[in-house]
């Protein structure tokens, strides 16, 4: 189902001896959201395991199934970001007959790696910006000394520059304003425009 949280899916897969989903344990999102945004970690994404998705057309309410070969996935992009189709479930293929003990251990190691380097203890929506070609958004932000910079209750994480956390009572405007400031500063100092991974809904955003 599209609403299953990725960490929940990761643990279920490991307990059933299914390999290939261990990396999803630290991703703060759902199966449907991950496919829609083509979210991932390094070179990994659920698109690699996808067979098909069931979608509902939000205009006609027609439900249909789309095979992976008919979906044009790109870096942090899928056509579902631009059409009227909402993902309601997906068929995914993982390798069977894995060693359950080893899979659980790998899953826990991956989670520890995330919690050691990312603000897993605070509310966030994961990485804010796409990585520019041959560079890293977090590295650019950190080089400008922006970690810890705040607008309202929204703060650039002190652990990782490409995360915005709700450190108190952040609202959506605080977060959008902080995203805009980051983009302006990185463009001014580095000559690079950081493109958001996240989608803006209800805002006049270019």
Residue ranges and their predicted role:
Residues 51-55:
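Short polybasic amphipathic segments
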Residues 22-30, 36, 122, 149:
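Short glycine- and Lys/Arg-enriched binding-loop motifs that mark or flank ligand-binding interfaces
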Residues 46-48:
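Short glycine/proline-enriched turns and hinge-like loops at secondary-structure junctions
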Residues 5, 28-35, 42, 128, ...:
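Gly/Ser/Thr-rich beta-alpha loop segments that engage phosphate groups in nucleotides
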Residues 34-37, 73:
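Short Pro/Gly-enriched beta-strand edge/turn motifs at strand-loop
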Residues 1-31:
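Anion-binding (especially nucleotide phosphate/pyrophosphate-binding) glycine-rich loop
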Residues 37-44, 64:
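Core subunits and conserved enzymes of cellular information-processing
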């Amino acid at each position: 189902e599209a609403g299953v949280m990725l960490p929940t899916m990761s643990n279920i897969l490991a307990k059933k001896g299914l390999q290939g989903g261990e990396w999803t344990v630290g991703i703060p999102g759902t199966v449907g959201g991950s496919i829609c945004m083509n979210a991932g970690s390094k070179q990994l994404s659920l698109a690699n395991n996808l067979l098909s998705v069931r979608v509902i057309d939000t205009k006609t309410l027609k439900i249909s199934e789309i095979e992976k070969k008919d979906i044009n996935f790109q870096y942090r992009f899928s056509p579902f970001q631009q059409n009227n189709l909402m993902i309601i479930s997906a068929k995914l293929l993982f390798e069977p007959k894995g060693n359950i003990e080893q899979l659980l251990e790998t899953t826990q190691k991956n989670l520890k790696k995330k919690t050691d380097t990312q603000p897993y203890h605070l509310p966030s929506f994961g990485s804010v910006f796409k990585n520019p070609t041959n560079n890293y958004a977090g590295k650019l932000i950190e080089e400008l000394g922006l970690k810890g910079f705040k607008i309202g209750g929204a703060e650039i994480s002190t652990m990782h520059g490409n995360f915005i956390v709700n450190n108190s009572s952040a609202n959506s405007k605080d977060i959008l304003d902080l995203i805009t400031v980051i983009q302006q500063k990185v463009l001014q100092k580095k000559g690079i425009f950081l493109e958001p991974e996240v989608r803006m809904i209800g805002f006049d955003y270019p």
